[in-house]
Amino acid sequence: MQTYKVVVLGASGTGKTSLTVRFVNGDFVETYDPTIEDLYRKVIETNKGEHIMLEIMDTSGTERYLAMRDLYIRNAQAFVLVYSITSRVSLLELENIKNYICQVKDRPISQIPMVVLGNKCDLEDTRVVFPEEVEALTKKWGIEDFLETSAKIDMNIQSAYDCLTLQLMSKQSFLNGSSNGKDKKDKKEKKTHKKDSGSNNSSINSSSSSLSVSGGSNLSISSSCSSSSFSNLSNSTSSTSVNNLNQSQTNAPIRTKSKRSLKSAKVDKNPKGKCLIM
């Protein structure tokens, strides 16, 4: 089963956690508890009848956890940008987030699956942001899908993830490439380093030479072996493992991934409907 990483981003207090919990568990979170990091999983069915796994990272909206947010953006394939219709500041912040995503991913926004959600649309009496202006703004940004949502009354949340899933399927060719320019640069540097290492080994093996070691002994290198064969090593103050010479140049630290707590997961068959853009 194919797994896609989705990151939910937006200002603090816009209802990111409530939207995510409503989508994954079908529940509404009444109390506000600032999030540091929560990972949710849900299996959904695509419009082609295939099942995929969405790993949804609910992030903090505070500046304190920017370093963590960078890591999530770098590893994610899709993004949910959330603002509150009761806060114009939260809408203005989305443009900075959108620009930063493009910078980290090193791609145009047209190649990145992304939806913009205007949350808390059940609070009509305190609305300060209207759908017409946001629709014009997202069109200017190049974002395909914009919806107004409500975690409280469960409005348009399923439709939002339907739209995001369709984008994931249609932009599959971009997702299969390198996640960003930095990855391409790292791969190029590794390839160059490997080539240089190979050239150095070839120059060592191409001719016989005599190396002076402690105690006045000679260390012979034979060109007839693919891996250097050493002989006539005597009167040395300590025995040396020759094989470690090559290994010490190629060994690299192994990175491990920390475990994250996973919330509940369930299988949901999405209705195959057209995305509703408000």
Curated annotation (Swiss-Prot):
Keywords: Cell membrane, GTP-binding, Hydrolase, Lipoprotein, Membrane, Methylation, Nucleotide-binding, Prenylation
Placement of sequence motif Effector region: 32-40
Propeptide boundaries: 276-278
Membrane topology: Lipid-anchor
EC number from the UniProt entry: 3.6.5.2
Top enzyme category: hydrolase
Region (Disordered): 176-209, 236-278
UniProt-listed NCBIfam families: small_GTP
Name this polypeptide is given: Ras-related protein rapC
Species: Dictyostelium discoideum
High-level lineage: Eukaryota, Amoebozoa, Evosea, Eumycetozoa, Dictyostelia
